[in-house]
Amino acid sequence: VHLSGEEKAAVTGLWGKVDLEKVGGQSLGSLLIVYPWTQRFFDSFGDLSSPSAVMSNPKVKAHGKKVLTSFSDGLNHLDNLKGTFAKLSELHCDKLHVDPENFRLLGNVLVRVLACNFGPEFTPQVQAAFQKVVAGVANALAHKYH
């Protein structure tokens, strides 16, 4: 992903303020609610029967944090996203059989959750920079599918 110096500063500056557990749980929870077919990958998470059950589910929150922790690794290696996410791409492709379109959906949900959490601080410039990053991460995660 090619980001200008300003874009990198915007992304890393905001990301440093992100509560990974809170935003991760909100992002994964929102994905599971808005795109309910994604729930099939999380059979072991227990009750996902309603929006409130999803959003209060501790396994959703924990996995959301895990997802954003990996995303943080990507932010530290923007010039090598494919390498950074190679093992996760392989896992999601070969073992979990996740449709790679779900990575794009989760990226878009993450951008929306960040906007909700940071309000005016999430300027159009910050949003544009994050869109580039989530697109790059989604592409890297889909790499093994090609």
UniProtKB/Swiss-Prot annotation:
Any one GO molecular function term: hemoglobin alpha binding
Residue positions binding heme b: H63, H92
Entries under PROSITE patterns matching the protein: GLOBIN (PS01033)
Transmembrane segments: none
Modified residues annotated as N6-acetyllysine in this record: K59, K82, K144
Tissues showing expression: Red blood cells.
UniProt key word Transport: yes
Ranges for domain Globin: 2-146
GO cellular component, one term: blood microparticle
Pfam families, sorted: Globin
Keywords: Acetylation, Heme, Iron, Metal-binding, Oxygen transport, Phosphoprotein, S-nitrosylation, Transport
Function: Involved in oxygen transport from the lung to the various peripheral tissues.
Family to which the UniProt record says this protein belongs: Belongs to the globin family.
Subunit structure: Heterotetramer of two alpha chains and two beta chains.
Protein name: Hemoglobin subunit beta
Organism expressing this protein natively: Tupaia glis (Common tree shrew)
